[in-house]
A protein has these predicted regions:
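N-terminal accessory targeting/assembly segments
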Residues: 1-11
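Walker A/P-loop
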Residues: 83, 88-89, 93
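Conserved ATP-binding TGD loop and adjacent catalytic N/P-domain core of P-type ATPases
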Residues: 79, 92-96, 102
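Charged helix-capping and loop-helix junction motifs
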Residues: 13-16
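Short, well-ordered secondary-structure micro-motifs
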Residues: 10-11, 41-42, 67, 92, ...
Length: 204
């Protein structure tokens, strides 16, 4: 779950969460909340060249909520993201009886305050929703993160180019003859997503 305005969206955090999900065999879906506060084109453009589903929520019109419900149906879904991005607000919009506590963004820190302090599971729409506590940062070098040799596979849009590089074991960062970097240069891949890959590669 991501915000388009407050707190400022971090594509690196989103990409870390998405990569962890892919590595563990979980389908990530990017849900952009607070879409009624500003245009979501920044986030949309970052993911339009990826294979990740992207949903923009407009609480004024209700746009996007039905699509979220469809993803929940028949599944166990976890709402994850930074504090203040609107996870509890999204849950309240989907399940008014949930009455999850929400809070304003800290003007001093520019980020959300923790209002959800434990994981709570709700039965809804033929599936289950796990509302998880927010966080301020997500470090890629913690135990259980993606092994460096698996990281390229955690970016599904890299898939068509893997195994096509000039050198075996290509890291897709500085090597000549890299098919991933060539696809990036040709505009087939998102620069933002590629930058996240490089940042994560340096962390793990």
């Amino acid at each position: 779950v991501a915000s388009t305005t407050q707190p400022t969206p971090s594509t690196l955090v989103l990409d870390k969460l998405a990569a962890i999900a892919v590595d563990k065999g979980v389908q990530p879906v990017i849900v952009c909340t607070k879409g009624d506060l500003a245009e979501a084109e920044f986030l949309r453009s970052a993911y339009e060249k990826s294979t990740l589903p992207f949903i923009r929520i407009d609480y004024g019109s209700g746009a996007g909520l039905d699509e979220v419900k469809q993803w929940i149906s028949g599944r166990l879904c976890a709402f994850c993201g930074n504090s203040g991005v609107g996870k509890s607000t999204l849950l309240n919009a989907l399940l008014p009886d949930a009455a999850r506590e929400t809070s304003a963004i800290s003007q001093k820190l520019g980020r959300g305050r923790h209002t959800t302090r434990e994981v709570t599971i709700f039965e809804a729409f033929g599936g289950r929703i796990a509302d998880t506590p927010g966080f301020a940062s997500l470090e890629a070098n913690r135990a259980g993160f993606i092994p460096k040799e698996n990281l390229e596979h955690a970016f599904p849009e890299f898939g068509p180019y893997l195994g096509q590089c000039q050198f075996t074991g290509c890291s897709h960062r500085t090597e000549k003859g890299c098919a991933v970097r060539q696809a990036l240069a040709e505009g087939k891949l998102s620069q933002t997503r590629y930058d996240s890959y490089c940042a994560m590669y340096d962390e793990v």
